[in-house]
Structure formats: C-alpha cells, structure tokens
Amino acid sequence: MAVPKKKTSKSRKNMRRAHDFLTTQSVSVCPQCKSPKLPHRVCPTCGTYKGKEVLDVAKAS
C-alpha cells in the first residue's frame, strides 16, 4: 500500500487546494421584464428565451 515518505507541508497543501474554491453564479438581466435570470435559460418570470415566448407563465401557475 502506498504511504507518503514525507509530511505534506501547509504551504504545499494550500497550493494544491488553490483551485478548489467555489465561484458565484453569474446573473444576467432579462431584456423583456428586466428581472434577474441565469444566462442561457428561460426567464422564470416572463417565460421568454432569446426574444421568443417559450413558456406560458400564466398557464403554468
């Protein structure tokens, strides 16, 4: 079974974990209703995507 020969230093451990952080989601604004929405997704408020109505929001709720 593999066992490390040397103890991993705090510096090396932190350098390895430098890319493990979480990133926040980018939020864009819907051009139709100006409400916040996630990019490349249908607007949950008005139901449009790229200027076309995809969902009938009044019928869905």
Curated annotation (Swiss-Prot):
One of its GO terms (molecular function) is structural constituent of ribosome. Keywords: Ribonucleoprotein, Ribosomal protein. One of its GO terms (cellular component) is large ribosomal subunit. Residues 1-20 are annotated as: Disordered. Pfam families: Ribosomal_L32p. SUPFAM superfamilies: Zn-binding ribosomal proteins. GO terms for biological process: translation. Residues 1-16 have a biased composition (Basic residues). Coiled coil: none annotated. NCBIfam families: rpmF_bact. Belongs to the bacterial ribosomal protein bL32 family. This is Large ribosomal subunit protein bL32. It comes from Pelobacter propionicus (strain DSM 2379 / NBRC 103807 / OttBd1). The gene is rpmF.
